[in-house]
Protein backbone atom coordinates (compact mmCIF):
# COMPACT_ATOMS: atom_id res chain seq x y z
CA UNK A 1 0.00 0.00 0.00
CA UNK A 2 1.30 3.43 -0.88
CA UNK A 3 -1.04 5.96 0.63
CA UNK A 4 -0.79 9.69 1.11
CA UNK A 5 1.46 9.61 4.16
CA UNK A 6 3.74 6.99 2.62
CA UNK A 7 4.07 9.05 -0.58
CA UNK A 8 4.75 12.26 1.34
CA UNK A 9 7.41 10.82 3.65
CA UNK A 10 9.04 8.53 1.06
CA UNK A 11 9.21 11.54 -1.26
CA UNK A 12 10.94 13.44 1.52
CA UNK A 13 13.42 10.56 1.87
CA UNK A 14 14.25 10.95 -1.82
CA UNK A 15 14.64 14.72 -1.43
CA UNK A 16 16.98 14.24 1.54
CA UNK A 17 19.01 11.56 -0.26
CA UNK A 18 19.47 13.94 -3.19
CA UNK A 19 20.55 16.77 -0.89
CA UNK A 20 23.09 14.54 0.85
CA UNK A 21 24.47 13.41 -2.50
CA UNK A 22 24.76 17.03 -3.64
CA UNK A 23 26.38 18.02 -0.34
CA UNK A 24 29.13 15.46 -0.75
CA UNK A 25 29.56 14.37 -4.36
CA UNK A 26 33.03 13.04 -3.56
CA UNK A 27 34.83 12.26 -0.28
CA UNK A 28 37.08 15.31 -0.42
CA UNK A 29 34.43 17.99 -0.89
CA UNK A 30 31.52 18.89 1.38
CA UNK A 31 29.26 21.73 0.29
CA UNK A 32 28.45 23.31 3.66
CA UNK A 33 25.35 25.17 2.45
CA UNK A 34 23.77 22.09 0.89
CA UNK A 35 24.70 19.97 3.92
CA UNK A 36 23.02 22.56 6.17
CA UNK A 37 19.85 22.23 4.06
CA UNK A 38 20.06 18.42 4.38
CA UNK A 39 20.62 18.68 8.13
CA UNK A 40 17.63 20.99 8.63
CA UNK A 41 15.47 18.78 6.43
CA UNK A 42 16.41 15.57 8.24
CA UNK A 43 15.74 17.14 11.64
CA UNK A 44 12.33 18.30 10.42
CA UNK A 45 11.58 14.85 8.98
CA UNK A 46 12.49 13.16 12.27
CA UNK A 47 10.38 15.72 14.13
CA UNK A 48 7.38 14.97 11.91
CA UNK A 49 7.63 11.27 12.67
CA UNK A 50 8.31 11.67 16.40
CA UNK A 51 5.85 14.50 17.14
CA UNK A 52 3.02 13.87 14.65
CA UNK A 53 2.98 10.45 12.97
CA UNK A 54 4.02 8.07 15.75
CA UNK A 55 1.85 9.74 18.42
CA UNK A 56 -1.18 9.58 16.08
CA UNK A 57 -0.61 5.86 15.53
CA UNK A 58 0.00 5.28 19.25
CA UNK A 59 -3.28 7.00 20.07
CA UNK A 60 -5.13 4.64 17.71
CA UNK A 61 -3.45 1.69 19.48
CA UNK A 62 -4.82 2.76 22.85
CA UNK A 63 -1.53 4.31 23.96
CA UNK A 64 0.67 1.42 22.84
CA UNK A 65 3.54 2.30 20.51
CA UNK A 66 4.01 0.63 17.14
CA UNK A 67 6.20 -2.48 17.39
CA UNK A 68 8.73 -0.80 15.06
CA UNK A 69 8.79 2.48 16.99
CA UNK A 70 11.56 1.53 19.43
CA UNK A 71 13.99 0.66 16.62
CA UNK A 72 13.07 3.76 14.63
CA UNK A 73 13.59 5.97 17.68
CA UNK A 74 17.04 4.49 18.27
CA UNK A 75 17.87 5.22 14.63
CA UNK A 76 16.56 8.77 15.01
CA UNK A 77 18.81 9.20 18.04
CA UNK A 78 21.84 7.96 16.11
CA UNK A 79 21.05 10.17 13.11
CA UNK A 80 20.50 13.22 15.30
CA UNK A 81 23.79 12.56 17.10
CA UNK A 82 25.58 12.33 13.75
CA UNK A 83 24.27 15.79 12.84
CA UNK A 84 25.97 17.44 15.84
CA UNK A 85 29.63 17.29 14.73
CA UNK A 86 30.85 18.87 11.52
CA UNK A 87 30.34 16.58 8.53
CA UNK A 88 33.28 14.41 7.58
CA UNK A 89 33.57 11.50 5.18
CA UNK A 90 33.03 8.89 7.95
CA UNK A 91 30.08 10.81 9.42
CA UNK A 92 28.34 11.14 6.06
CA UNK A 93 29.04 7.44 5.34
CA UNK A 94 27.46 6.52 8.69
CA UNK A 95 24.39 8.68 7.97
CA UNK A 96 23.99 7.00 4.58
CA UNK A 97 24.38 3.51 6.08
CA UNK A 98 21.76 4.14 8.76
CA UNK A 99 19.32 5.76 6.34
CA UNK A 100 19.56 2.77 3.97
CA UNK A 101 18.30 0.45 6.71
CA UNK A 102 16.00 2.95 8.40
CA UNK A 103 14.14 4.08 5.29
CA UNK A 104 13.51 0.46 4.30
CA UNK A 105 11.90 -0.25 7.68
CA UNK A 106 9.60 2.71 7.16
CA UNK A 107 8.83 2.34 3.45
CA UNK A 108 8.63 -1.40 2.72
CA UNK A 109 5.32 -3.27 2.53
CA UNK A 110 4.11 -3.76 6.09
CA UNK A 111 6.54 -1.10 7.28
CA UNK A 112 5.97 1.77 9.66
CA UNK A 113 4.30 4.07 7.14
CA UNK A 114 1.82 1.43 6.01
CA UNK A 115 1.05 0.50 9.62
CA UNK A 116 0.48 4.15 10.53
CA UNK A 117 -1.83 4.73 7.57
CA UNK A 118 -3.93 1.69 8.45
CA UNK A 119 -4.25 2.84 12.06
CA UNK A 120 -4.91 6.50 11.34
CA UNK A 121 -7.57 5.76 8.72
CA UNK A 122 -10.04 8.63 8.41
CA UNK A 123 -7.63 11.04 10.11
CA UNK A 124 -5.02 10.78 7.32
CA UNK A 125 -5.83 14.14 5.72
CA UNK A 126 -5.67 15.97 9.06
CA UNK A 127 -2.40 14.26 10.01
CA UNK A 128 -0.93 14.96 6.57
CA UNK A 129 -1.79 18.66 6.90
CA UNK A 130 -0.14 18.72 10.34
CA UNK A 131 2.95 17.06 8.85
CA UNK A 132 3.12 19.56 5.98
CA UNK A 133 2.84 22.47 8.41
CA UNK A 134 5.45 21.11 10.83
CA UNK A 135 8.13 23.75 11.41
CA UNK A 136 11.82 23.39 10.79
CA UNK A 137 13.85 22.70 13.91
CA UNK A 138 16.22 25.51 14.88
CA UNK A 139 19.67 24.26 13.99
CA UNK A 140 22.60 24.96 16.26
CA UNK A 141 26.23 25.23 15.18
CA UNK A 142 28.19 22.00 14.86
CA UNK A 143 30.13 20.94 17.94
CA UNK A 144 33.43 19.17 17.48
CA UNK A 145 34.97 17.74 20.62
CA UNK A 146 35.77 14.30 22.04
CA UNK A 147 32.67 14.25 24.27
CA UNK A 148 30.36 14.78 21.30
CA UNK A 149 32.11 12.08 19.31
CA UNK A 150 31.89 9.62 22.23
CA UNK A 151 28.18 10.34 22.65
CA UNK A 152 27.67 9.92 18.90
CA UNK A 153 29.43 6.55 18.92
CA UNK A 154 27.27 5.39 21.84
CA UNK A 155 24.07 6.47 20.05
CA UNK A 156 25.14 4.56 16.93
CA UNK A 157 25.92 1.44 18.99
CA UNK A 158 22.59 1.66 20.91
CA UNK A 159 20.81 1.68 17.56
CA UNK A 160 22.60 -1.56 16.67
CA UNK A 161 25.11 -0.31 14.12
CA UNK A 162 28.83 -0.98 13.99
CA UNK A 163 30.08 2.11 12.18
CA UNK A 164 33.31 4.06 12.48
CA UNK A 165 33.06 7.83 12.88
Each PLM stretch: what is its role?
Residues 1-165:
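Small-residue-biased structural context
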